[in-house]
Every structure is written in structure tokens, then in C-alpha cells.
């Protein structure tokens, strides 16, 4: 999974502070990609992260690479780059083929009734044998859906769609990644 987002924040912005955004693009945006990986692949038990500043002039890393080892034996990679143009892709490989999702778009600044977020624009399934299937995802306001689900759960309605255990694991995973970025070592995720 890769995530690029030209944040280039002003020096006084919270995203420009290493204390507020450890491991570069991980904390402002990459955590959402980690949530998707946890949802698809289950808990992650070990991580290795390298994170450094190559281009930006603020006190924050712009290039972060994370290797993940899932409890079920799978492996994963998350890269975040905050010094390039925006982009997002997720690719999952299996014995029958692979699926690639890419092209997250967000119409920022549009009135709420016009704003639409497309989590993934193009979806492509490539079987090991046979022709690829490609389709476009429908626009969907992800932020609005998340806030509505939270409000419903807080009001005694249906439970929030992300299990609490996954949320706690995501926080522990983020902490382990930040530790690895600082230590330069593989870190266990409790």
C-alpha cells in the first residue's frame, strides 16, 4: 500500500511538528491505510520502520517505509511520502491473482452537499489466468459516513462499524511503528 500526499504544511501547522506527526506521513494519513490493512489481513505482530526527511524544510519526515508481519503469516508494506503529489493505492496478492485499488480522490472545499470522496477510483482484479476485470468505484463521502456512524453509535444506535479491538490494535500498531522509526529495530506489536 502506498500513500503520497503533498502536505507541505506551514512551519507553524501541527503537521509540521515532529512531536505531533512522528514517522512522517504515517500519522496524518497513513494510519487510515493501516486501518484498511488490519481490516483485510487481521492483527499485525511485528513492524520495522525507517522514516527520514529528504526534501521538506519543516521538522517532519517526508519519506516513511514500513514493513509489517501479520499474526496469520502474511506480510505487508506501507509507504508514505509527503513531498510528492497526492496518490493512493492498495494491492493485495493471493494465489488466485491480485486486486489493485487506486486513485483516492477528495473534492476539498466543495459545499457539503457536493463534496464526494471516492475511497478508491479504479479497481482492477488480475487473475493468475484469464483477463483482468476493471471497474470504477462510485463516489462516496467517507468522512460523512464515518461521522454519521459515530453519531448513531453514540446515540444508542447500531455499533460503530469498526470493532473496538481493531481500533485499540491500530493505536498499538502506530505506537510500535513510531518506536521502530526511533530505534531502527523490528518492534513487537502488543
Protein language model features and the residues they cover:
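A general structural signal for well-ordered alpha-helical segments in protein cores
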Residues: 11, 33-34, 143-148, 174-175
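Glycine-rich phosphate/pyrophosphate-binding beta-alpha loops
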Residues: 31, 79-88
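C-terminal hydrophobic helical "lid"/dimerization subdomain
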Residues: 167-182
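Active-site beta-strand termini and strand-to-loop segments that position acidic
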Residues: 66-73, 92-94
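A short, glycine/Asx- and small/polar-enriched loop/turn
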Residues: 59-63
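Predominantly a Rossmann-like dinucleotide-binding segment in NAD(P)-dependent oxidoreductases
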Residues: 1-50, 54-57, 184
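C-terminal glycine/acidic-rich active-site capping loop/insertion
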Residues: 93-165, 187-190
Amino acid at each position: 500500500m502506498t500513500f503520497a500526499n503533498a502536505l507541505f504544511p506551514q512551519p507553524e501547522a501541527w503537521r509540521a511538528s515532529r512531536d505531533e506527526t512522528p514517522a512522517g506521513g504515517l500519522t496524518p494519513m497513513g494510519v487510515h491505510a493501516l486501518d484498511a490493512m488490519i481490516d483485510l489481513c487481521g492483527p499485525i505482530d511485528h513492524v520495522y520502520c525507517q522514516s527520514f526527511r529528504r526534501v521538506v524544510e519543516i521538522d517532519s519526515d517526508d519519506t516513511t517505509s514500513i514493513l509489517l508481519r501479520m499474526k496469520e503469516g502474511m506480510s505487508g508494506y506501507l509507504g508514505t511520502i509527503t513531498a510528492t503529489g497526492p496518490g493512493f493505492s492498495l494491492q493485495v496478492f493471493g494465489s488466485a491473482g491480485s486486486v489493485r485499488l487506486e486513485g483516492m480522490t477528495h473534492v476539498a472545499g466543495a459545499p457539503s452537499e457536493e463534496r464526494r470522496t471516492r475511497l478508491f477510483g479504479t479497481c482492477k482484479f488480475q487473475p493468475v489466468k484469464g483477463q483482468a476485470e476493471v471497474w470504477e468505484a462510485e463516489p462516496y463521502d467517507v468522512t460523512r459516513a464515518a461521522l454519521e456512524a459515530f453519531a448513531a453509535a453514540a446515540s444508542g444506535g447500531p455499533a460503530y462499524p469498526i470493532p473496538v479491538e481493531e481500533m485499540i490494535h491500530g493505536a498499538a500498531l502506530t505506537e510500535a511503528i513510531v518506536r521502530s522509526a526511533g530505534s531502527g529495530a523490528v518492534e513487537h506489536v502488543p
